[in-house]
Curated annotation (Swiss-Prot):
Known function: The C-terminal part of CwlO shows a cell wall hydrolytic DL-endopeptidase activity.
Low complexity bias locations: 291-337
Organism for this UniProt entry: Bacillus subtilis (strain 168)
GO-annotated cellular components: extracellular region
Tree of life domain: Bacteria
Basic and acidic residues composition bias: residue spans: 33-44, 251-260, 267-277
GO BP term (any one): cell wall organization
Name the record gives this protein: Peptidoglycan DL-endopeptidase CwlO
UniProt-annotated stretches for the region Disordered: 31-52, 79-98, 237-337
Positions with biased composition (Polar residues): 241-250
């Protein structure tokens, strides 16, 4: 009977192991996908912030371009107005020059007439001097035939003299007037030329401003184009990240579904194992009863045989009792093992393979895995403490579910070095490690294998629900 029960137990363990091995990659993938999703969401946040900043930058560039366009229009209007004024001043300048030229011609003509008249007067004076001066006038008067003729001749002579004087005076006045007009026109010409020079300087300055604004306008357009392109690229990246996140979530959902199915199957197998253990206990009790009856029968028939049988029965009973008691101790909860060096011994042994031991779901349950230092989280904790003389369960039967029942529960605020800390990863209490103090713990995880991690890490912080067990003190 015992042999058949052992065979059944081995078959159960082998069956469970064959199921756990392919499940390893799924658990690892689930945790890796969580990290990937966190990275994607972090990148999405960065991209969203970049898009917002770039869109704000684009708006500012567009506003700046509109401002430059208005300034360009104002400068262009001023340049056009200045150009028209320059043309008007040039025309006025040419007209003034023409008027000056005309006045100069008139002045020369007047001067010529005055000069001509002066020559005539000079001849008359010369003639009078040659003829005796006043004697000539007397001869004219004495040559009159009557008194009336005398009066007429005297009046005529006086009129000629006065006319010559008036003509000379008028010519002098005309000349002075022309010279004044010429001076006025020269002053006007200077003013026109000064205004023209000022306008031309203004035109050059406006042309310079136009060139500068054109350059700024081109730069603004180029910046807008560059920023718009950056926004387009960021939006494409955001779209790609959204697709990656959707794919990751879909993969997470698929793995979660498979894990739930696997967990259900494991639970079913555990229930079957429990039923098998109960059957084994019942069979053991039946065998003991039958053996006792047989022993009593032997006692009644033979004294010497009775003593021998009793010795054998006692030996068997003691052995059975010892084994049962040992099994109870290894699986019982609520007992804190006293081992002063166990904690530091376990931590020392476990720390010795940090960074050197890969994670394997279901690993550490064969001698080959143990020799090669290949564990999962629960088998690593069991091995570390076992190496320090603390028994937390059998090699093939220690899981997070059995470890969470070991020792005594303590609050997270009271946990200390050596306590077991549990995390809700792919299931409740799906991961376990040894608390080191200062917010760190020693564990074997899918990402880094055996490592020392911080409980303030966002992933572990979210997974830690305050489950702590003290197994050694």
């Amino acid at each position: 009977m015992r042999k058949s029960l052992i065979t059944l137990g081995l078959a159960s363990v082998i069956g469970t192991s064959s199921f756990l091995i392919p499940f390893t990659s799924k658990t690892a993938s689930a945790e890796t996908l969580d990290e990937k999703k966190q990275k994607i969401e972090s990148k999405q946040s960065e991209v969203a912030s970049s898009i917002e900043a770039k869109e704000k930058e684009l708006t500012e560039l567009q506003e700046n371009q509109s401002k430059i366009e208005k300034e360009l229009k104002d400068i262009n209007d001023k340049a056009l107005d200045t150009s028209n004024k320059i043309e008007d001043k040039k025309e006025e300048n040419d007209k003034t020059k023409e008027e000056i030229k005309k006045l100069k011609k008139e002045i020369k003509e007047t001067e010529a007439r005055i000069e001509k008249r002066n020559e005539i007067l000079k001849k008359r004076v010369r003639s009078l001097q040659e003829s005796g001066g006043s004697q000539g006038y007397i001869d004219v008067l004495l040559g009159s035939t009557s008194f009336g003729d005398f009066i007429s001749r005297a009046t005529a002579v006086s009129s000629i003299v006065d006319a010559d004087k008036d003509l000379i005076k008028q010519q002098e006045q005309d000349k002075a007037k022309l010279e004044d007009s010429e001076a006025d026109l020269n002053d006007k010409l200077k003013e026109v030329q000064a205004a023209l020079a000022k306008l031309e300087t203004m035109q050059k300055d406006l042309d310079k401003q136009l060139n500068e604004k054109d350059k700024l306008f081109d730069e603004a357009k180029a910046s807008q184009k560059k920023t718009a392109k950056a926004i387009s690229e960021l939006k494409s990246e955001a779209s790609e990240l959204a697709n990656q996140k959707a794919n990751t979530e879909a993969e997470q959902a698929r793995i979660k579904k498979e894990q739930e199915a696997a967990a259900a199957l494991i639970k079913k197998q555990e229930e079957a194992q429990k039923a098998s253990d109960e059957t084994q206990t019942d069979d053991s009790q039946t065998a003991t009863t039958e053996s006792s009856k047989a022993s009593s029968s032997d006692d009644s028939s033979d004294n010497s045989s009775d003593n021998s049988s009793n010795g054998s029965s006692n030996s068997s009973s003691n052995g059975s009792s010892s084994k049962k008691s040992s099994g109870s101790n290894s699986n019982s909860g609520g007992t804190v093992i006293s081992n002063s060096g166990g904690i530091e011994g376990a931590i020392s042994v476990g720390s010795s393979i940090v960074g050197q031991s890969p994670y394997k779901f279901g690993g550490g349950r064969t001698q080959s895995d143990i020799n090669n230092r290949i564990f999962d989280c629960s088998s690593f904790v069991r091995w570390a403490y076992a190496s320090a003389g603390v028994n937390l369960g059998p090699v093939g039967g220690t899981t997070t579910d059995t470890l969470v029942g070991r020792g005594q529960a303590v609050s997270a605020s009271e946990m200390k070095r050596g306590d077991l800390v549990f995390f809700d990863t792919y299931k409740t209490n799906g991961h376990v490690g040894i608390y080191l103090g200062n917010g760190t713990f020693l564990n074997d995880n899918t990402s880094h294998g055996v490592s020392v991690d911080s409980m303030s890490n966002p992933y572990w912080k979210a997974a830690f629900k305050g489950v702590v067990r003290r197994v050694v003190q």
